[in-house]
A protein has these predicted regions:
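Conserved beta-strand elements of the Class I
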Residues: 35-37, 77, 155
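Glycine-rich adenosine-cofactor-binding loop
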Residues: 142-170
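Rhodanese-like catalytic fold shared by cysteine-dependent sulfurtransferases
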Residues: 1-35, 42-75, 82-147
Length: 170
């Protein structure tokens, strides 16, 4: 029985599979259906994310994983800042029946120290987050989709009738 968080974390890490950042880079190149998930909080993601990663804060991972990857045998790689939260997340996903989950040892900090490429996605401002809240909660749109809409050029012709706020959300 774990007597401290450190003991508990050691116990968790002993029960999951961890890979190095170099292993992850190799997996990204070779494993066609690999899903990489960043479990950090949005403000942490502003410092850069691993290319192609899905951004799902740890607090929402278990709720959203079936939408992201319904196949419980598909390969998943989880990372956070240092590898601790991703290890805990890997344990939780294993308990949900996901059988091919790895945690990236050292997290994005180790990725950055290794000189591997990070993406710096454009994020919504606080005002935009409030304005587009109704769209961003939809899994089909989310923050990524809303950011794409903001970057797009849109022409609205004859949409809706008088008083119809069709273009309000664009």
């Amino acid at each position: 029985m774990a007597t401290s968080f450190t003991d508990y974390l050691k116990q968790v890490k002993a029960g999951i599979r961890e890979v190095s950042v170099h292993d992850l880079a190799e997996m990204q190149a070779k494993v066609k259906d690999l899903t990489v998930i960043d479990v950090r909080e949005p403000d942490e993601q502003d410092n850069g994310v691993i290319l192609g990663a899905k951004l799902v804060p740890r607090g929402f991972l278990e709720q959203r994983i079936e939408q992201i990857q319904p196949d419980r045998a598909a390969p998943l790689a989880l990372y956070c800042a240092s590898g601790n939260r991703s290890a805990l997340s890997a344990k939780n996903l294993a308990e949900l029946g996901y059988t091919n989950v790895v945690s990236v040892s050292g997290g994005v900090s180790a990725w950055s120290r290794a000189g591997l490429e990070l993406d710096h996605p454009k994020r919504l401002t606080r005002e935009q987050t409030a304005r587009y809240a109704r769209q961003t909660i939809l899994p089909q749109i989310g923050e990524v989709g809303q950011t794409k809409l903001l970057n797009a050029k849109v022409l609205v012709v004859g949409a809706g009738g008088l008083g119809s706020p069709t273009a309000l959300y664009l």
